[in-house]
Amino acid sequence: MTLLKKIDSPYDLKKLSMGEMNTLAQEIREGILNRVNKIGGHCSPNLGIVEATIALHYVFNSPVDRFIFDVSHQCYTHKMLTGRKSGFIGDIIKNISGFFNPSESEHDPFVLGHTSTSLSLASGVAKARDINGDNYNVIALIGDGSLSGGEAFEGLNNAATLNSNFIIIVNDNEMSISENQGGLYKNLKELRESNGTSSNNFFKTFGYDYHYLENGNNLEELITLFSSVKDSNKPVVLHIHTLKGNGYVPAEENKEMFHNTVSGRINGKTPIIPSNLPETYGSITTEFILKKHEQDKSIVAITAATPGGVSFTKDFRQKMGDAYIDVAISEEHAMGFTSGLAKNGAKPIFAVQSSFVQRTYDQISQDIALNNSPVTVIVHCGGMSGIDMTHLGTFDISMISNIPNIVYLAPTNKEEYLSMLDWSIEQVEHPVFIRVPLGEPVTTGKVDKTNYSDLNKYQVVRKGSDVAIIALGTFFKLGKKVYDRLKQAGFNPTLINPKFITGIDEDLLDRLKDEHNITITLEDGILDGGFGQKIASYYGDSEMKVLNYGGKKEFTDRVKVTELYERYRLTPELIFEDVMKLQSGNLLYA
């Protein structure tokens, strides 16, 4: 990596010849593959945008000119060219994130990680520039299906009214995470096939100047195109056709698998693809849906462009046929669409990751809960993890559980999960959300016969006295460990599996007061507005002392789960210490 080692800023790039920059592009690809193989990350999106990013930094003048990448998952080349190559070559400096982060560099204007936001952010930057009387280029790069998101349409509509410099680069690699979905992409296909000359041009209807480049991986042509619009005085769209996974044959041939991959998959030209994958809650879900669909054709499976993230594999999608619907990157629409299906007699199952539920609050409240639509929403990745700060799964409990009419369930094992799914699909009284447990499936081998229509009834797993442990969902495993630790110390605790996030079992809580003086709540999410605070509020000024355990209301960035557990005192030993201090009257934060 002779050339890359010499690049510490875009200024160094501008000194290179065309031949040297093409060589640099190959070195950058080696850096991308090195990082992804060692720590995982977005592979094929970054391989496809190498030349375009080099051309951007060669033609424009970052950080004076502002680059705003949609999602920013395709920022690896950008980072290598802006002084952060240590995150990609050699042993990898892991504190370099896989997304834009202003704390790392002035070349990253925003913290980014969710989709379809670039046009809104960039148009705001451009408008402020005009108000301030400044003069620089504002460039938004959007691709990988992000144009299908509602905010992208809104941003595109608003930015078209700017009478000043605003450059949109549409990175058209013919893919979202999986296949592109929706009518917009039919128009992009028509534009590609006509070399950008079709009179049916989505962007021109908004009033944008439009330029098409067929070979979006040709560095020289990209530099020519970008130079032609530099310092333009009106909004313009540059539509570049790129190859997702370019330069690494396995990623070119399997774009979806290599969109975002785990470490250890890359071995020269032969990818390491695991076989005999273990059972997961995702595979349990798809197997269940397929069996139900064989018996009931009204069942519909829905995703918002993240089929892999919710285990909707290609095989599953093919078997479901028209009953599988990918609504593209449009979670807000997905919630409304799901409500419409349910209200008209279908049985929709929308699978979505916790972090993306945040985008849909109004649709959950208005379109689903207010209408009491009997939807089933499966929430994946809810809980603490070592993920970056843009994809945290710790806010869904507080958000969803405080909306009226919603029933939010927290299974602790495979059998409960299947029972909840079956009940939710067949009942017609409530909107139901189910928080999928984190980690490997736990199985009891016994069918769960709970009647979930009897709302907010907790299960007493082990009856005792003195201390009651109410352990929600994924943290039921922690609850059992706390139970064992207290038992070891001579306590006779009660262990409770609440199953319901959205309500409290008042009868049970009242009975606990007879033989218990301490209640512990455990939840895998933030405490503020969460499950445990409802228990504490119910006990109010009674003699029951309540210890709530969960996360702090904060954005954590790639912090190890074990470190988070220590930080939040989520270990059996630390919880035991708190119980002992509370009994002696020395606990200050009870």
Label every model-predicted segment.
Residues 108-264, 270-278, 282-287, 406-516:
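Glycine-rich ThDP/TPP pyrophosphate-binding loop and its adjacent helix/strand module
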Residues 272-275, 386-388, 406-407, 526, ...:
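Peripheral docking tails and interdomain loops at the edges
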Residues 30-37, 96-112, 133-139, 314-325, ...:
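Glycine/charged-rich beta-loop-alpha catalytic/anionic-binding loops adjacent to active sites
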Residues 1-80, 215, 239:
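N-terminal amphipathic, basic-rich helices that act as targeting or association modules
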Residues 248-357, 363-373, 471-473:
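Non-catalytic terminal/interface segments that mediate subunit docking, oligomerization
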Residues 39, 65-68, 111, 132-149, ...:
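A short, small-residue-rich loop immediately preceding and capping a beta-strand
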Residues 42-162, 299, 304, 313:
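Cofactor-binding active-site loop characterized by glycine-rich and histidine/acidic residues
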Residues 86-96, 161-175, 369-381:
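A glycine-rich helix N-cap at a beta->alpha junction
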